[in-house]
Amino acid sequence: MNKARYTQDVPEDRIKLLESIASYNKPFTLMVVGGVDSGKSTLITFLGNELLSLGFKVAVVDSDVGQKGVLPPGTISLAIPEGPFESMSELEGVAHYFVGTTAPSQFIGEMAVGVKRMVEIARNVADVVLIDTTGFVTGVGAEMKRLKAELVKPDIIAVIHSGELSGLVKALEPYGGVIELAVSETVKRYPLEERRNLRAEKWRNYFRDSQLVEFSASEVAITGTSLFHGIPLNADENELLEKAFGWLVVAGWKNKGYTVVKADVEKFPRAHSRELKAIDFEKLSNLLVGLIDGEGLCMGVGVLKWINFSEGRLQILTPVRDLSGVREIRFGRIRVTEEGEELGLLRRDEL
C-alpha cells in the first residue's frame, strides 16, 4: 500500500506554487510543512512529477522519519527521480542520514543536520530540491522546523494548514518566503493503526534480503551510546556492583562515571546515582543501528542481534552488502524486528 498517491485533482493554490517554482532562478529549494495528514507528501509528488515533465532535474529530501516514503525508516533520505512516480515509496535513496528513531522529539539536532546534509548534496545535482517533513509541528516540533529552515534557508516554505499554524508561519518568515496553502478537501486521513501497518510493511521490505554480519568494536567507532567508552571494569568491580544493586553485570566501563550493561537478579533492584548509567541488556536486542561511512552518512541500517562483550564483537542483521566503507556503528532508539514488529522506543538517555 502506498501513502499519498499522486492525483491530478489538484487545488488552484498548488498550481500557482508550481508556476512560481518553474519561474524561479535555479537551483531552487522548497520546504513543505504541515501537520499529520495535511497532504505534504501528495504535494511533493505532484510538484515532482510536474517539474520533471517541464524538464527540470528534481531532488526529493524525505525527512518524515516516522512515515518514510523513501526507505529505510528512521533516516533522512535523498532521492533523485529519473521519471514519473505515483508515490514517494517508489523512489530509491541515493544518500541517507541516520536519526535512529521514528519519534524524533529528542533528536532535533540530528533532524536539522540530516536535512542540511541532504540538501547540500541535492543542490549540487538538481534544479529543484523538494523537502518533505514530519507532521510534528507543535512544541519541540515547531522548533525543529525553525532550525531546519534556518540551516537550509529555502527559497519558499509552503505551510499547509487551516489557521492553526499561524504562529509557526511567523517563526519561519525570517528564513524563506512563506506561502500558506489550504488543506485539500480530498486529503486522506490515516488512523494510527494503519500508520503502524504501513511502517511495518516498510521495515519488512527493507530487511527482506538481509544477512547477519559481524563488526569489531576495536575496528569501528561505536556512537550514540555510552557502551565501549571508557576503561573496562575488572572482575572485582563487577562483583561489587552486583552485590550492591542486585544485578548480573554483563559488561561495564568507567570514565567520569560508570556505565554498566546489566540484568536484574533481585525482584526489586536498588536505586543508583546518576553517576552510574545502568543499561538493561534486553533493551539492546533488536535495536536499530546505522552503518555510517567516513563522511558521517548512513550506508544503511541494521538490527542489532547480539553483542559479545568479552570479545567486543557486534552481530547485526542488515541488507547492506558492501561493508568495506563502514567506519562507525551508531545506536538508534527504536527496537524493531526484521519482520517489521516494533518492540518499543527508548529515551535518548537510556543508552
From Swiss-Prot:
Residues binding ATP, per UniProt: G34, G35, V36, D37, S38, G39, K40, S41
Job of this protein: Polynucleotide kinase that can phosphorylate the 5'-hydroxyl groups of both single-stranded RNA (ssRNA) and single-stranded DNA (ssDNA). Exhibits a strong preference for ssRNA.
The protein's name: Polyribonucleotide 5'-hydroxyl-kinase TK1956
Keyword Kinase appears in the UniProt entry: yes
Organism expressing this protein natively: Thermococcus kodakarensis (strain ATCC BAA-918 / JCM 12380 / KOD1) (Pyrococcus kodakaraensis (strain KOD1))
Highest rank taxon of the organism: Archaea
Entry keyword annotation includes Transport: no
Organism lineage: Archaea, Methanobacteriati, Methanobacteriota, Thermococci, Thermococcales
Enzyme class: transferase
Reaction catalysis annotation: a 5'-end dephospho-2'-deoxyribonucleoside-DNA + ATP = a 5'-end 5'-phospho-2'-deoxyribonucleoside-DNA + ADP + H(+); a 5'-end dephospho-ribonucleoside-RNA + ATP = a 5'-end 5'-phospho-ribonucleoside-RNA + ADP + H(+)
A GO term for molecular function: ATP binding
Annotated disulfide bonds: none
Keywords: ATP-binding, Kinase, Nucleotide-binding, Transferase
